């Protein structure tokens, strides 16, 4: 069995949507379990393509320009191929800061667009993934000693802890010159992990074990009757920082379709209103867009916990009386709310029916449709053939994919990576596609030309640094070169 290592990584991207925005830079450092570096750091850029516009805010923040990535980068197929290689080393735990919710999604969608299995590196050969953002939140909520906690003002003007990486490093004397450079952020993430491991080693090791879903599931005890289930603590960014990002929760139901999701109830909230609702009313309350909600909208404190996403779960015994008081937890009130749920004979049936109803989702372009279904074994074999074929062979071959998503992705894959192999007709089709996406906003466009221009005009009114202005000027020159 291979010795386990942690591959700490980070992306810089051209936007904030991992489904639709593209990667600009990737960096990573491999360590052993003692957080000592193993081997040399890796860092590379991805060449941009002409079917998307980099977001001006991304360029302003990172200072990475399309010209830089065009000059120093590699094509997207090679970019994600290299990333697959480092993640696929047996015994690798892929880790980062907010990586499960963002960076891992960038990886999955990048692999998918480039015919690489988007999930294999997460579980094959003893591999897994981890994310220390919730470790940081958990440390703050339960065992804050030994670490300096920076603060910020929340939306209600309340001073709360800030979990931004650059704020944590500054508060704890960790050098992070060049924040929003992928390699700098990776080094800072490792330093924060070392800090917690040093001051709260038991908590660090406990949370490290939660990267394995078979260690998480028993904590949520859904295998026993509802009346016997234990209240657990859950730490999540979905809970207010003013409450320590922490709430006591009661596990209710294993999602009947997605077995990795456990529906739980936040016991800070009285469940009476939810228990009185019909299934339709529960669905309406949960999924109605905020803009359509009226003053009669009743908050339903249901939360899905994904056992395969390294959730921060702990027994209530880990919360000292002092910390419980600090986070305004009234255990008598918590127990009253729990009893209401346990004593209701209909809630589990209602939730099962709610989960079984398939919600309609809008049209999704093939590039962003990774979660439109698993790839069949036959199509996966064809994907592997694509990966081992030369650009010249790809230009003379049209794989017989059963999946319409893959059929749509194939010509785009060739055009993005090897435009020189396109026929004249294919070049015209690619140009028309790019124009339709960027100018007309078709094909699930992330940022249209009009939106791009509007944001530039807004930024022109702000007090930009010389570096920011130079970066934006280069961005404009780049876009003018192909629009």
Predicted regions and their residues:
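Charged, compositionally biased non-catalytic regions
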Residues: 182-229
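Generic hydrophobic alpha-helical segments
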Residues: 79-83
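Metal-dependent phosphoesterase core characteristic of DEDDh/y 3'-5' exonuclease domains
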Residues: 21-26, 30-62, 85-201, 370-374, ...
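Acidic catalytic cores of enzymes that act on phosphate-bearing nucleotides/polynucleotides
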Residues: 209-292
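Non-catalytic terminal regions of proteins
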Residues: 270-483
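A general structural motif at alpha-helix termini
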Residues: 73-74, 111, 169, 211
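Generic detection of long, well-ordered alpha-helical segments
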Residues: 73, 101, 183-186, 261, ...
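Conserved RNase H-like, two-metal-ion catalytic cores of nucleic-acid enzymes
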Residues: 1-75, 85, 254-259, 263-298
């Amino acid at each position: 069995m291979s010795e386990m290592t942690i591959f700490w990584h980070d992306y810089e991207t051209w936007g904030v949507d991992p489904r639709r925005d593209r990667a600009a830079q990737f960096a990573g450092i491999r360590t052993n379990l003692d957080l000592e570096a193993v081997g040399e750091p890796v860092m590379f850029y991805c060449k941009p393509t002409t079917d998307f516009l980099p977001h001006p805010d991304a360029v302003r923040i990172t200072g990475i320009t399309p010209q830089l990535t065009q000059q120093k980068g590699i094509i997207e197929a090679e970019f994600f191929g290299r990333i697959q290689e480092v993640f696929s080393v047996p015994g690798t735990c892929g880790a980062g800061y907010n990586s499960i919710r963002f960076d891992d999604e960038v990886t999955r969608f990048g692999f998918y667009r480039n015919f690489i299995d988007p999930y294999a590196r997460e579980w094959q050969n003893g591999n897994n993934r981890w994310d220390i953002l919730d470790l940081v939140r958990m440390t703050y909520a339960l065992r804050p000693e030994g670490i300096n906690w920076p603060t910020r003002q929340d939306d209600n003007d309340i001073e709360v802890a800030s979990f931004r990486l650059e704020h944590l490093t500054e508060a704890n004397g960790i050098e992070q010159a060049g924040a929003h450079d992928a390699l700098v952020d990776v080094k800072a993430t490792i330093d924060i992990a070392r800090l917690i491991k040093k001051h709260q080693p038991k908590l660090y090791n406990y949370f490290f074990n939660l990267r394995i879903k078979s260690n998480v599931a028993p904590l949520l005890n859904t295998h026993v009757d509802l009346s016997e289930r234990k209240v657990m603590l859950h730490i999540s960014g979905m809970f207010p920082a003013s409450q320590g990002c922490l709430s006591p929760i009661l596990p209710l139901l294993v999602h009947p379709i997605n077995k990795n999701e456990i529906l739980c109830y936040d016991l800070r909230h009285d469940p009476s209103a939810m228990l009185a609702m019909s299934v339709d009313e529960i669905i309406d309350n949960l999924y109605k867009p905020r803009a359509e909600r009226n003053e009669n909208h009743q908050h339903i404190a249901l939360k899905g916990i994904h056992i395969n996403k390294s959730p921060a779960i702990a027994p209530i015994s880990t919360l000292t009386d002092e910390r419980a008081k600090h986070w305004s937890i009234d255990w008598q009130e918590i127990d009253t709310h729990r009893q209401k749920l346990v004593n209701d004979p209909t809630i589990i049936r209602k939730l099962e029916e709610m989960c079984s109803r398939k919600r309609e989702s809008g049209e999704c372009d093939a590039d962003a449709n990774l979660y439109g279904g698993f790839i069949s074994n036959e199509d996966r074999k064809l994907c592997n053939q694509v990966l081992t074929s030369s650009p010249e062979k790809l230009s003379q071959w049209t794989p017989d994919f059963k999946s319409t998503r893959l059929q749509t992705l194939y010509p785009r894959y060739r055009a993005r990576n090897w435009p020189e192999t396109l026929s004249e007709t294919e070049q015209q089709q690619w140009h028309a596609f790019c124009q339709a996406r960027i100018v007309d906003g078709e094909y699930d466009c992330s940022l249209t030309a009009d939106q791009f221009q509007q944001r530039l005009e807004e930024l022109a009114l702000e007090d930009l640094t010389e570096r920011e202005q130079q970066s934006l000027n280069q961005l404009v020159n780049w876009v003018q070169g192909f629009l």
